């Protein structure tokens, strides 16, 4: 987690329209320096993609994106995203990390600036992490 005065030891290299972020690990996310991680909007956790930058680029250009994004595609998504500004991402309600069994078709969505979404994700992740650690404290 990043807090005021700390440096995030990873380099954000991409984001996606569903609100996920891709990062090159600089030590923040695991021991695999140079590994690529995905901040998943459905878990609010960094997940290793078990690849490095060149593998990520190959996947982004030639990989099975339909499989990767199958849970965040809705009827008409392609046409809707074609009109979208590249500085925006979708924010879903209920959030994707809540009610995970709920289809994306049944969620409302709006576009928001990617930097606001990044800040929101970090804040939510921080709050959830603090709640979990508070649960571990003795009464």
At which residue positions do the language-model features occur?
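A C-terminal-region feature
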Residues: 1-139
């Amino acid at each position: 987690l990043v807090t005021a005065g700390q440096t995030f030891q990873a380099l954000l290299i991409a984001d996606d329209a569903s609100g996920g972020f891709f990062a090159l690990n600089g030590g923040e996310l695991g021991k695999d320096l140079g590994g690529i991680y995905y901040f998943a909007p459905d878990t609010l956790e960094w997940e290793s993609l078990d690849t490095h930058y060149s593998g990520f680029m190959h996947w982004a250009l030639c990989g099975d994106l339909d499989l990767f994004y199958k849970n965040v595609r809705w009827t008409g998504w392609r046409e809707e995203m074609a009109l979208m500004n590249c500085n925006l991402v979708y924010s879903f309600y209920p959030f994707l990390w809540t009610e995970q069994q709920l289809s994306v078709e049944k969620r409302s969505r709006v576009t928001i600036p990617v930097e606001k979404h990044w800040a929101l994700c970090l804040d939510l992740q921080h709050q959830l992490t603090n709640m979990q650690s508070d649960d571990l404290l003795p009464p």
